[in-house]
Amino acid sequence: MRNYKFIWVLVLSILMLGGVNSCSSENSEPEVDTFDVDFVLPAGIDTQKGGIVSFVVRDGKAPETTDLMYFTTDDGISRSCTITETSSASFSVKLSNGIVEGDYSVSLKRGSRRKEFGKTHITFVKQVEFTPDEGTTVWGVVSCGDKGVANVVVSDGYLTTTTNTDGIYQLKSEKTWGYVFISIPSGYEVSSKGVLPQFYTTLKSDAKTLERADFTLAKVEGQDNFRMYIFGDMHLANRTNDKAQFKVFTNDLNKYLDSHKSGKSYGLTLGDMTWDLYWYSRGYEFPQYLDEINSQVSGLQIFHTMGNHDNDFKAKNDFDAAFQYVRDIAPTYYSYNIGQIHFIVLDDIDCSDYDGTESRNYEKNFTSDQLDWLLQDLSYVDKSTPLVITTHAQIFYPKGNNSFALDGQVIERWPNTKKLLNILKGYTVHFVTGHTHTIFNALPSETAPLGAENVFEHNAGSICASWWWSGYLTPGVYVSLDGAPAGYSIWEFAGKDIKWKYKAVGMDENYQFRAYDLNNVSFSYSDVPNISTSTKVQNAFDYYVKAYPKNSNNEVLINIWNWNSNWKLSVTDETGKELKWTQTVAYD
């Protein structure tokens, strides 16, 4: 068994040094050659700044000590390094001080000849004695400052473990997903890359190769009281003037953030940040989404949930459909802790039946692997800890006034949904979902008949309202499918106490309903002389014609978009007289 060194990640500055350690300044490129040298170039190198790195020689084809090894960045900056010793089995290289952490292309130069060997990633570390168990394929340390952090949950999406007293973890991972992630412990934060919290790291070696993956935490105070800003479907695709409308949302969010600076704030999406169909036809994918949001929102870590439109429709299985999301955004399921709350992100979009076409034949389902991981994750969470769980598609669905069903009552989905609800028994759970472009709240009394226990669901509206169409056709008007305005949710946490509200884009936060005097509301075809002759359009408008004929019944229709059945409602007329109200289902 090999003896590996315990490693601490170091934060380094780029140093531009002269002499041997400087960038290559040759006026001409060396001739590319294939001189007889061969060695194993690992996908990742853990070392120290200016350290010695050893390489395994293949078939005795070692370099000479007079050769130079070059490490070249993606933007063309090269660093030359000397070979300190060599044999038929291995050789060692002294890294120049100008080399910093990152990706490099590696080549050897002999005189005027040069040979390329591929790419590697250099990570700087500090050594401490540690020997991984036999069979371990991933290990590392979770640290804060110069100390390891104990009891941090670490997972590869299949296996889950915790760090020991020195902050060390190890996993016998098959590296199926190609990453490991931590469940950020309460009282800590991770660094950010733009809006993305860096709680996971991509693995660089194959499943048989032992490698390191470290995490660095920062201690924070006052996390028991915080706000979570929750963003439903965005559907950015560079169409229907969506980017300009998205700027209206980010301006509203930034204004609210600026006026509510007390306490910690975080963000959370509910999926469908992008629109898979337009990845290819309009070239708008996750990098473009990240450019968009990073250019407009700063100082807010945003955790992400995956939606159906965040899967690649050209894939032919669930794993491949998620590839680009995992590469650019985050794992498809994971957890983290803030204050006294445990957050869980799940993926309930199963693309196993994708056929590589625009049919996008997905199912709303939780895979067994995901539920197995959830069981492990919750084994570290006390039953008294509230859970906030985000999925893209809804778990329940309104049937009528204060009545709900399991979403769609799709028989194929029942077993895993019911398994999920059984796993969650004993916890107080708040599901937060998107997908519908509507708003509804299901309370424990309404979900209990469906096999849930202490379970809420909050279907939380959307940023794009009706896929940006209302604002495109009528600038400044952002209306969702249920008449609710485009907006986002603001959740306030005080210990284990949770409050939530919906904030309409461009409106005061107290704007929570819209009222119509039905004496002055009616629809007829004469209102729209230029209506499309399409049967689909005609039939859709006909619903409103039949629902709202001219009348003088002195009725008021009130759309309270974030309603829940525990609310108390008082309606008065202009004289202060209280009016009787009846809950109804109607078009808005």
Which ranges hold each PLM region?
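C-terminal motif of bacterial Sec signal peptides marking the signal peptidase cleavage site
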Residues: 18-22
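Extended active-site neighborhood of metal-dependent phosphoesterases/phosphodiesterases
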Residues: 190-192, 198-204, 279-381, 408-430, ...
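Metal-dependent phosphoesterase/phosphodiesterase active-site architecture
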Residues: 129-138, 195-205, 209, 232, ...
